[in-house]
A protein has these predicted regions:
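Post-cleavage N-terminal segment of exported redox proteins
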Residues: 3-4, 18
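Long, amphipathic alpha-helical surface segments
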Residues: 20-51, 59-66, 72-94, 112-168
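Sec-dependent signal peptide recognition
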Residues: 4-10
């Protein structure tokens, strides 16, 4: 019972936050339609997760979160996807027209694979964007490895994402 109340409270808070956080075309370098395309693209490639550490459309469970893939609805999964995507957009907001592309990539590989950490340097992709170099196709596509191996389906996903969301 307590868990249901917490989940309901979280959903109410998230929906209020999402309503305020929904991209407005006037102050962001992309449209609502593009944002919805990103959501649809991620849903298509991620599918519905029911693994131990991931739920919904690829939401990685954080410490203290207790979502269950068995009881989660599609609407709850959609909400988590949008919140995660908005969090990524906030992290990459200073990259302007590239924020959407970087956010889509970060949803799959994690933001710090791109931004770097104290132990990991910034990605070559991000360094090129910061220098104004628009020739980033190969660097974007290079994020197609899993356990050191290139995965054709991930490479295809990167190509689709790049074609849909790269702004010249």
């Amino acid at each position: 019972m307590r868990m249901r109340i917490r989940l309901l409270a979280l959903l109410c808070l998230c929906s209020v936050g999402l309503a305020r956080a929904t991209p407005k075309t006037s102050n962001l370098p992309f449209t609502d339609k593009q944002f919805e395309m990103v959501v649809a693209c991620i849903k298509h490639f991620e599918g519905w997760h029911n693994m131990k550490d991931y739920v919904g459309y690829g939401h990685q469970l954080q410490k203290g979160e207790r979502y269950s893939a068995k009881t989660m609805t599609k609407a709850q999964g959609d909400l988590l996807l949008r919140l995660d995507l908005m969090r990524n957009l906030y992290l990459f907001r200073k990259y302007g027209k590239d924020a959407l592309l970087l956010s889509v990539l970060a949803y799959n590989v994690g933001p710090y694979a791109i931004l770097g950490t104290s132990k990991r340097p910034k990605s070559r992709l991000l360094r090129k964007i910061e220098c104004g170099d628009r020739n980033i196709y190969n660097d974007y596509i290079s994020f197609c490895r899993w356990h050191g191996r290139q995965v054709p389906s991930i490479k295809f996903r990167r190509q689709v994402e790049y074609d849909l969301f790269f702004v010249k």
